[in-house]
Amino acid sequence: MATVSMRDMLKAGVHFGHQTRYWNPKMKPFIFGARNKVHIINLEKTVPMFNDALAELSKIASRKGKILFVGTKRAASEAVKDAANNCDQFFVNHRWLGGMLTNWKTVRQSIKRLKDLETQSQDGTFDKLTKKEALMRTRELDKLENSLGGIKDMGGLPDALFVIDADHEHIAIKEANNLGIPVFAVVDTNSDPDGVDYIIPGNDDAIRAVSLYLSAVATAVREGRSQDLAVQAEEGLVEAE
């Protein structure tokens, strides 16, 4: 089963929080102390909390659950996309559009438009347009791909959110809360843990730390999905590959 050790976390700098003056007092239970005016996160709390989160995400994946990775900060953007693709899940890695979950009906129409434009760009429709019209549609396609490309095949609301930086993604968390979708999130010392069902106290800026979370989650999800396939194979529903 996918797990992460304290040594892995120390090497990745998971324990380095934000400057003490930016702290959120609600994170006090997860703070070990301060060094050079920077809060140090208590990894004795983080390790079991993260491993619990991984086990639960694996369970959700084993039930064919859809997991939406959310990380729109520039530094995390590419890693979020790669991790989601790596385990055949979904992602939002540029900008969270308000209503992305709570107004799914409208989002679905935009996804339909995105798919129509993709078809047009491949079937020669764009070639028949004036240069200006083709350019306008290409721009629209790029814009839609940027914001919705990671969820265009989700086919409905996700069963869980995995969030890098609870502070930065507070709108996504609020929408998931409103819909009763469980939230798994990396919560740094400057963030509010309210609304997060599975709190992972840790550094949300260092790329090594972010990569550690993402690759562990992707592995846990893949393991969960392979359990699902193994069960189906036993029941004779699919032929084991």
Swiss-Prot record:
Biological processes per GO annotation: translation
Highest taxon listed in the record's lineage: Bacteria
Transmembrane parts of this sequence: none
Keywords associated with the record: Ribonucleoprotein, Ribosomal protein
Pfam families given in the database record: Ribosomal_S2
Listed GO CC annotations: cytosolic small ribosomal subunit
Alphabetical list of InterPro entries matching this protein: Ribosomal_uS2, Ribosomal_uS2_bac/mit/plastid, Ribosomal_uS2_CS, Ribosomal_uS2_flav_dom_sf
Assigned protein family: Belongs to the universal ribosomal protein uS2 family.
UniProt-recorded name of the protein: Small ribosomal subunit protein uS2
Organism: Pectobacterium carotovorum subsp. carotovorum (strain PC1)
